[in-house]
């Protein structure tokens, strides 16, 4: 049956999204007004993160994984760790022997 694996992937993505939304239930309506307000604010922030994750999961299944490797790096053999300013002598690091310490 053609397309069966794609359907399974989509169903699995939907199950993941369902679990994400179930993991962030609405806050309870008890407590002081300020406590309820803070709980709702935190819940909305978490809900926005869940929405973003759900969109990424669905986009990955529908459109395939995104290629976020925008920066082309040179081969690792050409990379080195050194101080580019360490090769030059700086006037700031010289000590004047005539200066007095107070």
UniProtKB/Swiss-Prot annotation:
Q: Where is this motif: Nuclear export signal and binding to XPO1?
A: 71-82
Please give one Pfam family short name.
Answer: REV
Return one Gene Ontology term, BP aspect: mRNA transport
Q: For this protein, what post-translational modification is recorded in UniProt?
A: Asymmetrically arginine dimethylated at one site by host PRMT6. Methylation impairs the RNA-binding activity and export of viral RNA from the nucleus to the cytoplasm. Phosphorylated by protein kinase CK2. Presence of, and maybe binding to the N-terminus of the regulatory beta subunit of CK2 is necessary for CK2-mediated Rev's phosphorylation.
User: Region (Disordered): which ranges?
Assistant: 22-47, 81-102
GO molecular-function annotation terms? DNA-binding transcription factor activity; RNA binding
Q: Give the location of motif Nuclear localization signal and RNA-binding (RRE) in residue numbers.
A: 32-48
UniProt KW Translocase keyword: no
Gene3D superfamilies documented for this protein:
6.10.140.630
The residue ranges flagged as biased composition, category Basic residues, are 33-47
Keywords recorded for this protein, A-Z: AIDS, Host cytoplasm, Host nucleus, Host-virus interaction, Methylation, mRNA transport, Phosphoprotein, RNA-binding, Transport
Which residues are annotated as modified residue Phosphoserine in the UniProt record?
Answer: 5, 90
Q: Which parts of the sequence are annotated with region: Homomultimerization?
A: 16-24
The places in or outside the cell where this protein is found are: Host nucleus, Host nucleolus; Host cytoplasm
Look up the record and report any one GO term of the cellular component aspect: host cell nucleolus
Signal peptide range equals: none
Instruction: Give the UniProt family note.
Output: Belongs to the HIV-1 REV protein family.
As a miscellaneous remark, the entry gives: HIV-1 lineages are divided in three main groups, M (for Major), O (for Outlier), and N (for New, or Non-M, Non-O). The vast majority of strains found worldwide belong to the group M. Group O seems to be endemic to and largely confined to Cameroon and neighboring countries in West Central Africa, where these viruses represent a small minority of HIV-1 strains. The group N is represented by a limited number of isolates from Cameroonian persons. The group M is further subdivided in 9 clades or subtypes (A to D, F to H, J and K).
Oligomer status and interactors: Homomultimer; when bound to the RRE. Multimeric assembly is essential for activity and may involve XPO1. Binds to human KPNB1, XPO1, TNPO1, RANBP5 and IPO7. Interacts with the viral Integrase. Interacts with human KHDRBS1. Interacts with human NAP1; this interaction decreases Rev multimerization and stimulates its activity. Interacts with human DEAD-box helicases DDX3 and DDX24; these interactions may serve for viral RNA export to the cytoplasm and packaging, respectively.
Q: Note what the entry says on domains.
A: The RNA-binding motif binds to the RRE, a 240 bp stem-and-loop structure present in incompletely spliced viral pre-mRNAs. This region also contains the NLS which mediates nuclear localization via KPNB1 binding and, when the N-terminal sequence is present, nucleolar targeting. These overlapping functions prevent Rev bound to RRE from undesirable return to the nucleus. When Rev binds the RRE, the NLS becomes masked while the NES remains accessible. The leucine-rich NES mediates binding to human XPO1.
Q: What this chain does, per the record?
A: Escorts unspliced or incompletely spliced viral pre-mRNAs (late transcripts) out of the nucleus of infected cells. These pre-mRNAs carry a recognition sequence called Rev responsive element (RRE) located in the env gene, that is not present in fully spliced viral mRNAs (early transcripts). This function is essential since most viral proteins are translated from unspliced or partially spliced pre-mRNAs which cannot exit the nucleus by the pathway used by fully processed cellular mRNAs. Rev itself is translated from a fully spliced mRNA that readily exits the nucleus.
Protein name (record): Protein Rev
């Amino acid at each position: 049956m053609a397309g069966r694996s794609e359907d399974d992937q989509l169903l699995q993505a939907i199950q993941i999204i369902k679990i994400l939304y179930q993991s962030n239930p609405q806050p309870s309506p008890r407590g002081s007004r300020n406590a309820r307000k803070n709980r709702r604010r935190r819940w909305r922030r978490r809900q926005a993160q869940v929405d973003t994750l759900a969109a990424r999961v669905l986009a990955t299944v529908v459109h395939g994984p995104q290629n976020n490797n925008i920066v082309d790096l040179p081969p690792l053999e050409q990379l080195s760790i050194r101080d580019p300013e360490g090769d030059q002598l700086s006037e700031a690091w010289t000590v004047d022997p005539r200066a007095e310490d107070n």
